[in-house]
Design a protein with these regions (language model features):
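Membrane-interfacial loop-to-helix junctions in multi-pass transporters
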Residues: 56-62, 96-105, 137-138, 190-200, ...
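N-terminal alpha-helical transmembrane segments of multi-pass membrane transport
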Residues: 3-122, 132-139, 150
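Helix-loop-helix module between adjacent transmembrane segments
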Residues: 72-73, 116-117, 146-173, 182-221, ...
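Membrane-interface loop-to-helix entry segments
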Residues: 5, 67, 72-88, 199, ...
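Alpha-helical membrane segments and immediately flanking helix-loop junctions
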Residues: 99-134, 160-163, 169-185, 202-208, ...
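Hydrophobic alpha-helical membrane segments of integral membrane proteins
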Residues: 138-145, 265-268
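Loop-to-helix junctions at membrane interfaces in multi-pass transport proteins
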Residues: 24-37, 44, 177, 215, ...
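Interfacial loop-to-helix junctions that mark the boundaries of transmembrane helices
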Residues: 45-60, 228-243, 268
Length: 330
């Protein structure tokens, strides 16, 4: 069979799901029908659950991350709390040497804004709402606990990323999990070094899937729904044609990220403070408008924190915020 025929067979196979939907289906419906079984299959693998007692099942990946976070929290003597002031001082540039060029491509503040740009968003709002709806107000307590534990895991990730990164002659930097997995484990012997390379490749592949799925699709999906809602609902230009808005956003984001981390940082250090400001102000407005309900809410959070339903709801909320709503912060 010639190469052209092989490509024709492959292409026809890929288009079959679209053709079977019908001519009346919109592009959005065709894409959703084509992608849904794929995403469901991936989720079945990634979020495989294990029983934890009391009739509850929890994704294994969540248990693994929590175990690691708890270990690092105790190993580093609660660094997430103890080092909070130091972290602020670093971001403010207290330890910068004005006489020497710091290693790295961006400033401490730009690194922070780049990280926050992928953290503050859908997960922070939807994750909390879902946790409370499932486990009650007490679920909020467990989400705070999980957040503090996650900070310790983030600390070790960033530390290893800095320790094992590579700075090239042109000043650019390469680093991250793929580097500290391969280079770090190599110091533990040949066998561990080979394992590190395998894990590095696996992470890189998984990272692509995560960035396309949780990192992009979830965000643009929710943004599109809000846009359609405020521009007329079923009468909106984008109703049934959400791909148009998606294409526009893809082009805008593409122009930013194609310049690498420096280009991203230049945008985030201007946009993120404004974005976070709106986020915090909006939260304060809601709290101010419901001042009389705050004492009761705090009481319900504390009293319901150790209810089994609240604990489970908190775990699910953390899972949705950190994984299904995009694993940004950790």
């Amino acid at each position: 069979m010639s190469l052209l025929k092989k490509m024709s067979v492959i292409l026809s196979g890929e288009l079959t799901p679209f053709l079977s939907i019908g001519q009346d289906a919109s592009i959005d419906e065709q894409i959703e029908a084509y992608m849904e079984p794929v995403t469901n299959s991936i989720m079945d693998v990634i979020f495989v659950t294990v029983p934890v007692g009391f009739g509850y099942d929890v994704p294994f990946v969540l248990i693994w991350l929590l175990v690691g976070a708890i270990f690092f929290t105790f190993y580093f003597n609660f660094i997430s709390i103890r080092g909070f002031k130091h972290a602020i001082d670093v971001v403010k540039g207290k330890f910068d040497n004005p006489n020497n060029k710091e290693a790295g491509e961006v400033s401490h503040f730009q690194a922070l804004t780049a990280a926050l740009s992928g953290t503050v968003g859908v997960g922070n709002i939807a994750g909390v709402a879902i946790a409370v709806s499932i486990g009650g107000p007490g679920a909020t307590f467990w989400m705070i606990v999980a957040g503090l534990l996650g900070m310790s895991a983030k600390f070790i990730e960033c530390t290893l990323g800095t320790k094992y990164r590579i700075q090239h002659p042109d000043g650019s930097v390469s680093g991250g999990p793929s580097y500290y997995l391969s280079r770090g484990l190599a110091k533990k012997g040949k066998t561990m070094g080979q394992l590190g390379k395998v894990l590095a490749v696996m992470f890189a592949i998984a990272c692509i899937g995560g960035s396309l799925g949780g990192g992009n699709m979830v965000q643009i999906n929710q943004a599109t729904k809000q846009l359609i809602s405020v521009t007329g609902g079923t009468e909106s230009l984008f109703f049934g044609q959400a791909w148009i808005f998606g294409a526009i956003m893809a082009a805008v984001v593409g122009m930013i990220i194609i310049g690498g981390i420096k280009s991203i940082a230049r945008v985030t250090d201007k946009v993120v403070p404004f974005m976070v400001g709106i986020y915090v102000i909006s939260a304060l407005v809601v709290l101010t408008g419901n001042l009389s309900a705050i004492p009761s809410a705090l009481n319900q959070i504390i009293s319901g924190a150790f209810d089994s339903g609240a604990m489970y709801g908190g775990i699910i909320g953390v899972m949705i915020q950190g994984f299904k709503r995009a694993a940004f912060s950790n």
